[in-house]
Every structure is written in C-alpha cells, then in structure tokens.
C-alpha cells in the first residue's frame, strides 16, 4: 500500500491498496490541501498521487477524502479546484494519461464540486481535461447509492476516469462500473434494514464492514 501521514487531526489519511502482481508503483506523493479561507485549524486530508504501470501502460491515481457534510459546499468545491489543477497539469504533460480520480468526495455525482472537477454524466462530448462520471447515471437514473442517510441514498464514493480510459479502442480501457451490493454488506433487519451494515453504531459493535458500500470500475484490454 501507499500511505503518507497527513494533517487531519483525527488521523484519517488517504491510502492506495494495490496488488503488486497487477500494478507497479513508479512514483507517489501527498499534495497537502491548502487551507480554506485561511483556516489553518481544520486542516483536511491531502491528495495522494500514485503513478505506476498496469498491464504494460502508465496509469495514475489520485486518492481523495474531501471534507465532510459538516462543512458547507464551498469547502468541497475548494478541494475540487485543487484536484482540477493537479489533473490539468498531469494531462498537459501526457495527453494520453489514463488517470483515475477516486475516493469519498462527500458530495453526490451531480453536485457543484464534481462540476468543478469536470466530471460529466456522459462520455459523448468529453473534452481532453474532463472526466467520465458513471456514478451520476447510477444514482440519478437507477437510484443506487453507496450510503443511506435519513432514508435517502447518496453516492459519495466513486472513481472518475480521464478521456483516454473511456475513449481508447485498444489497450487498457473502461468496460463498466457498479456499486458493489451484496447481502452480507446490508443490514437485514431492525430500524436500519436495507442500509449498509456498519462496523459499529455508537458504542454498539455491529460486526459489519462500513456505512459506505464499495464502488468498482472494471477495465479490459
């Protein structure tokens, strides 16, 4: 795995867990998030950039965990602007870069922060600096999300893909994506039936996995 200690006061950091038989790391760094409106007290997670080789090609990941919904939308837009600057720089350097921006963005796929990043609902009309955001359709059109809050599904956890990933005719390219929903990940009874099965609720151990469901992007070559 790739991990750097970040400035979050609770010790929550971003990391990339990978299979060394599938992916070889060539370079990595943590880019610290700049304070929002000069607030140096509530520092948030940085942006973990991991460059490497997979299936004989260069790929790059930016791992994120944007500020929670306890903060208002402009704080996450601020994070998105910083990631956008990073992706613009990477794609200027290598226009064919297969780049994945991933993590818990604490916003839904159609929210302002994702528009700031340039994450689009559809592949058609994508510009070189934009990303395909398959989760927009999954949430908005299919009603599937990764976390349930007050009876409503949100989809905060996602992987968006640069144009070379979705437009490639050969080599490593996008196939499909899904929210990984299985019975063992879901609360089967009680007040929260149908919600992701948490590890704990308050001080009660629930023996679950997470209050968020995983998302998967499938690639082919």
Residue ranges and their predicted role:
Residues 7-10, 40-43, 72-80, 149-153, ...:
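Solvent-exposed, acidic/flexible segments
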Residues 1-58, 66:
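Structured beta-strand-rich core segments of catalytic domains in phosphoester-bond hydrolases
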Residues 2-4, 36-38, 66-76, 101-102, ...:
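Second-shell loop/turn segments in exported
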Residues 42, 89-99, 107-221:
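Metal-dependent phosphoester-hydrolase catalytic domains
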Residues 73-95:
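A long, amphipathic alpha-helix that forms part
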Residues 27-30, 62, 73-74, 111-115, ...:
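Short, solvent-exposed loop/turn and secondary-structure capping segments
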Residues 2-7, 17-20, 30, 62-67, ...:
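Active-site-proximal beta-strand/loop segments in catalytic clefts of secreted hydrolases
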Residues 11-13, 44-48, 57, 79, ...:
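Residues that flank catalytic or metal-binding motifs in active/ligand-binding sites
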């Amino acid at each position: 795995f790739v991990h750097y200690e970040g400035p979050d006061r609770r010790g929550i950091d971003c990391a990339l867990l990978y299979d060394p038989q599938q992916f070889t790391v060539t370079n990595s760094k943590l880019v610290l998030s700049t304070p929002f409106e000069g607030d140096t007290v509530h520092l948030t997670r940085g942006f973990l950039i991991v460059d490497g080789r997979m299936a004989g090609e260069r790929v790059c990941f930016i791992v994120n965990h944007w500020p929670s919904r306890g903060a208002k939308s402009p704080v996450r837009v601020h994070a998105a602007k910083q990631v956008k600057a990073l992706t613009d720089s990477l794609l200027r350097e290598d226009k064919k870069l297969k780049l994945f921006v991933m993590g818990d963005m604490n916003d839904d796929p159609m929210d302002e922060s994702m528009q700031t990043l340039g994450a689009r609902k559809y592949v058609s009309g994508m510009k070189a600096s934009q990303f395909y955001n398959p989760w927009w359709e999954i949430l908005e059109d299919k009603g599937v999300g990764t976390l349930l809050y007050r009876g409503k599904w949100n989809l905060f956890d996602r992987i968006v893909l640069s144009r070379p990933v979705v437009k490639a005719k050969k080599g490593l390219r996008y196939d499909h994506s899904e929210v990984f929903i299985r019975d063992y990940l879901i609360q089967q009874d009680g007040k929260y039936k149908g919600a992701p099965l948490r590890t704990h609720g308050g001080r009660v151990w629930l023996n679950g996995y997470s209050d968020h469901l995983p998302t998967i992007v499938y690639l082919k070559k």
